[in-house]
Amino acid sequence: LRLDDSLEGLDELNDTLELSGAKLKSGHAELPLYRAPSLDWALSGQNGLRFNRDDAFRRISRSFHAVKDSEYTPPESLHNVLRKYQRDGYRWLRTLDGYGMGGILADDMGLGKTVQVLSYLLAMKESGQRLPSLIVCPASLVLNWQEECQKFTPQLSCVAVDGDATHRAELAKQWAEADLVVTSYDLMR
């Protein structure tokens, strides 16, 4: 191992994790939980550097690597509706939630992110967690969310916020009791 390689690896790690020079000099750095996947990815490529990973970090790392094998199963009413990759997306959301984190589902349009999120929200409701949840999307998709909610998760009450100010004021009276409130980016401004 060449020292230059180790220093380069340390520099890359520092850039990835945005560590201060003082933290590096101290030999100890604490990072927020949401940085664990980034840290794990960065450490996997550092063959010349030694790192101590505690049990909690190893457990978190394993759970993110094994999302597909997690114990989270979609709500019974959606289990046979979701495709395999959608069940994986559901498990990803549940894994993140299990650590108090949020995340983003991103793929090509039309692959079912809406139903993945709805399955997650239904599971939260079934487990007794208090809703409502707010969905902010393009105006062209507000009614789509409401239709998908009625189709796949009729157990969730959904309020689609649209229309003029008077209509929206009437809808606002329903928000507290709704499981899901859907609105557009424009109306959120």
Which residues are covered by each model-predicted region?
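Generic structural signal for beta-strand residues in well-ordered domains
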Residues: P75, L82, G98, G110, ...
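Short, conserved clusters of charged catalytic residues that mark active-site
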Residues: S77, D88, Q116-S119, N144, ...
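Conserved SF1/SF2 helicase motif Ia
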Residues: G100-I104, D108-E147, S157
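Charged, low-complexity
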Residues: L1-G103, L156, W175-V181, Y185-L187
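Glycine-rich nucleotide phosphate-binding loop and flanking beta-alpha elements
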Residues: L143, M188-R189
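Conserved nucleic-acid-binding Ia/Ib motif block in the N-terminal RecA-like helicase ATPase lobe
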Residues: P132, V136-V182
